[in-house]
């Protein structure tokens, strides 16, 4: 058994060789599972042919059984109708704590998240939405939808210019544009809405692969299950043909203990 708890691309792309040497793989490394679909399918097929096991529940939502629930639905003959999910504890912390400048500017809330250890060492990685994109690819593929990055509609949280320069320059850009963040917040709050960075996969016969996939900031009302999601929690709503009232999975989507327990469960399985 080989356990990959890194974020290394070098290690992630050695899984095929590990299979050939008789190892099964448990991974919380998202890189190879969200790689181009051609590589992903080759990896899965190789594991089956060789008789190895590849498990990666913790790549999405730490120990939350999001991927397992999707997989069980599909394997039972059910069909996914809609998945809506908040998959970044960092972004959820930021948007559940930012109040239009009251209690701190957007830049200050991001810095608090970094100081608390909720962000990557470089917080730009979190605010780029890249991590959420990878997680959406993984859960979509688990649902049997073979999408790549180009198939996802991406509404960037921040303009590309925010990511030029170093981290200090990034924080300076956030501070300079506080009025933009405050206006976004005020517009949503005036309608009784809250902002959440949402990843979704929705059945749509007119879309490629029969599903529409997107990530972006959304304003949701009080009837939505994601409305009261707070702190660093993740949540996923899974609606299927058999379950038109969606299954809601919610809880800590990150953390050393949570991730370790998920990895251990994959090892045992």
Which residues are covered by each model-predicted region?
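A short hydrophobic/small-residue beta-strand
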Residues: 25-26
């Amino acid at each position: 058994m080989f356990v990959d708890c890194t974020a290394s691309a070098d290690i992630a792309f050695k899984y095929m060789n590990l299979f050939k040497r008789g190892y099964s793989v448990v991974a919380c490394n998202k890189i190879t599972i969200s790689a181009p679909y051609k590589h992903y399918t080759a990896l899965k097929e190789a594991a089956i042919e060789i008789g190895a096991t590849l498990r990666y529940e913790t790549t999405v939502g730490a120990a939350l059984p999001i991927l397992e629930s999707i997989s069980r639905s599909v394997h039972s003959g059910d069909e996914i109708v809609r998945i809506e999910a908040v998959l970044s504890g960092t972004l959820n912390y930021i948007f559940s704590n930012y109040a239009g400048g009251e209690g701190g500017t957007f830049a200050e809330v991001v810095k608090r998240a970094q100081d608390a250890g909720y962000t990557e060492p470089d917080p730009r990685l979190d605010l780029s939405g890249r991590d959420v994109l990878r997680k959406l690819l993984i859960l979509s593929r688990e649902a049997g939808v073979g999408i790549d990055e180009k198939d996802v509609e991406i509404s960037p949280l921040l303009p590309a210019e925010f990511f030029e320069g170093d981290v200090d320059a990034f924080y300076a850009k956030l501070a300079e544009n506080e009025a933009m963040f405050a206006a976004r917040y005020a517009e949503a709050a005036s309608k009784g809405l809250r902002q959440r960075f949402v990843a979704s996969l929705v059945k749509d016969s007119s879309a490629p692969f029969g599903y529409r996939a997107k990530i972006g900031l959304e304003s949701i009302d009080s009837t939505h299950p994601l409305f009261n999601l707070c702190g660093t929690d993740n949540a996923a709503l899974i609606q299927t043909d058999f379950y038109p009232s969606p299954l809601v999975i919610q809880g800590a989507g990150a953390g050393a203990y949570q991730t370790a327990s998920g990895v251990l469960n994959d090892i045992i399985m």
